[in-house]
């Protein structure tokens, strides 16, 4: 993919023009990328909403769960994605004037219905292997979040690198960082710090793409330590998924990876363990 003289992404990208935009960005080019989730049921429904004049909202890009990409607004024009927003480091207010908005198709915050059913605000249920239990950076209690797919995270990273090569991108931010208390996207299921590092750090000699995408591997490993706690999220700060730990020799089905932590399924329970204790 590449960006043409009309500030459109060329390649396997669908152009769907949104009427919801302002004039040119400050300096007529962006220096910031803002990541969002759609909180919608599909990429297509979110594109329709962002292209409806009634919504008074838009974004430059929407990335589907299969990695498909839609562009709605040229990159040199103001899209209406950030709303009331500010950036402490630069002192800016109204980030729409400086940024490219990228929406990823994701249901967002979910409500637990049972051990294997989590409900979105629009009524769709998701299984436990598509859910992360985690505490948001701006909150105090653990909640349930829809996971992103490997395909859309890979597409997001590729697009952000293309944007960074074409424009003087200095900042990669989450909506939750520029509108804290008002917005929670892209949420703890999105590897925001890793994206920032991989887009803004020009030294890629030791790059590991799977470290960003948290790929699904779906194979079986065994516990190689006497006792191994299984937690509700990737880290010791998360609560135990069950009180009795796994024991040496127990088999677990690997679902996905987040750094050194691995999401596993065992006896119908989905949780997270430290990967160094699996073989």
Protein language model regions, located:
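SH3/SH3-like beta-barrel fold
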Residues: 249, 262-266
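Boundary regions of SH3-family modules and the immediately adjacent low-complexity/disordered segments
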Residues: 266-279
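SH3-family beta-barrel domains
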Residues: 207-232, 243-247, 255-258, 277-279
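Short, low-complexity, polybasic intrinsically disordered segments
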Residues: 181-212
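Acidic/histidine-rich, metal-coordinating catalytic segments
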Residues: 166-182
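Short alpha-helix capping/helix-loop boundary micro-motifs
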Residues: 235-241
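Active-site-adjacent loop/helix surface patches within enzyme catalytic domains
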Residues: 2-166, 170
């Amino acid at each position: 993919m590449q960006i043409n003289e009309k500030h459109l992404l060329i390649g396997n990208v669908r152009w769907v023009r949104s009427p919801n935009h302002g004039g040119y960005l400050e300096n007529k080019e962006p220096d910031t990328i803002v990541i969002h989730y759609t909180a919608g049921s599909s990429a297509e429904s979110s594109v329709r909403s962002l292209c409806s004049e009634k919504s008074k909202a838009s974004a430059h890009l929407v990335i589907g769960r299969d990695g498909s990409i839609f562009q709605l607004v040229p990159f040199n024009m103001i899209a209406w994605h950030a709303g009331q927003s500010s950036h402490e480091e630069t002192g800016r207010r109204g980030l729409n004037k400086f940024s490219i908005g990228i929406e990823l198709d994701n249901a967002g915050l979910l409500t637990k219905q049972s051990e294997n059913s989590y409900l979105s605000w629009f009524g769709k249920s998701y299984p436990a292997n598509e859910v992360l239990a985690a505490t948001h950076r701006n909150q105090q209690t653990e909640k349930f979040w829809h996971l992103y797919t490997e395909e859309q995270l890979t597409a997001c990273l590729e697009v952000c690198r293309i944007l960074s090569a074409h424009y003087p991108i200095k900042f990669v931010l989450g909506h939750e960082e520029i509108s804290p208390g008002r917005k929670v996207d892209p949420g703890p299921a999105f590897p925001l710090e890793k994206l920032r590092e991989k887009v803004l750090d020009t030294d890629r000699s030791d790059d590991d793409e799977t470290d960003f995408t948290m790929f699904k591997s779906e194979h079986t490993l065994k516990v190689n330590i006497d006792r191994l706690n299984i937690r509700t999220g990737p880290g010791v700060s998360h609560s135990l998924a069950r009180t009795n730990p796994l024991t040496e020799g127990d088999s677990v089905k690997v679902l996905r990876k987040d750094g050194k932590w691995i999401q596993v399924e065992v006896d119908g329970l989905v949780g997270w363990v430290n990967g160094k204790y699996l073989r």
